[in-house]
């Protein structure tokens, strides 16, 4: 497995190469083959968001307001020193190369960047109104291609202050800022819609935040203007006739509502997680209020993130994280609180369990479901973990020495381990045995075919 991990304390990204079963907290367990930092720029410039464009290119968004294009090159890891066997004799180079696993490691080079993408002044006036105890600071909430085609060279970079930047990678491999548009702040999330082929000259996305109701926005292909096409409405007052606070934290689209639809009304469906531990479900055909609001936690403990996956174990999540289904029947949700819990819920809000409940010791600052198979998790306890999405079993645990902000899995290919001399001999013996059995089978079939041919020939001669 090859991972890229955003490390907050050093402002670097670390490349981690490991196999299933790796656990750095256990001395006798399998250890990672390679952990190395790259592009360190310090605490004030850590990587907020990453998007891998291809095997040799990625785009990074840092909390200093900079978006960078990074070239990735790979080369075979060189053995820096000879191993010494228990007798104290140095192994020769051929023996060393046979005993160590072989794998490629990456080098990273910044080839282009765009800066000054934040507006902290816009958040200053909102800090006094926020229930947060700390000053609001700008940061990136989204970095992704504007089309669902992963090879697309035009990206959306959205910030907490409500700035929506359209950035393009030119033919000369340089980043160009095409446009900057404004949204209502503060923004906790911005989610693009990619579940069906819409008009090529329009793009749809949803956004929201603290006291900022969910809105659907349409942007044209020229990126010069945007239009709000729908806005949610708050639910009715609670049983004490108190206003329910608004704070959507994350959202995922579903496919359009099936069956009969009312003409003239938009047809979008989505589910959202709120700060106050509600799972809300919307259909624009139904109206502006959610058609379902479910309390996920009894004491309304704050939730911060949202990932979705299919209850049947199939990969039905789009490139941008939306759920490729018309209903919530098979929808499962993963969310995190600000303590140490990673919760799994079904589409009706029933808790299915906690992931890593006996191992995670700090708040999870990042979770992501990869290919419908793995849950990537990292946080304040400085460990990268990979869990099996079905069984919740921990597959990988690697200490990276820093708070974690983002994780990307480049591949899940296992690195082949070299065999000991006895294992090699056993493997060769088994290989010879299989070859002998195949040769014996071929010889037997040839004899049978020869007898059949001779029998047919004798019958013809008698006739």
Curated annotation (Swiss-Prot):
Signal peptide: none annotated. The gene is NSA1. The keyword Membrane does not apply. Belongs to the NSA1 family. InterPro entries: WD40_repeat_dom_sf (IPR036322), WDR74/Nsa1 (IPR037379). Transmembrane segments: none annotated. Involved in the biogenesis of the 60S ribosomal subunit. It is found in: Nucleus, Nucleolus. This is Ribosome biogenesis protein NSA1. PANTHER family: NOP SEVEN ASSOCIATED PROTEIN 1, WD REPEAT-CONTAINING PROTEIN 74. It comes from Saccharomyces cerevisiae (strain YJM789).
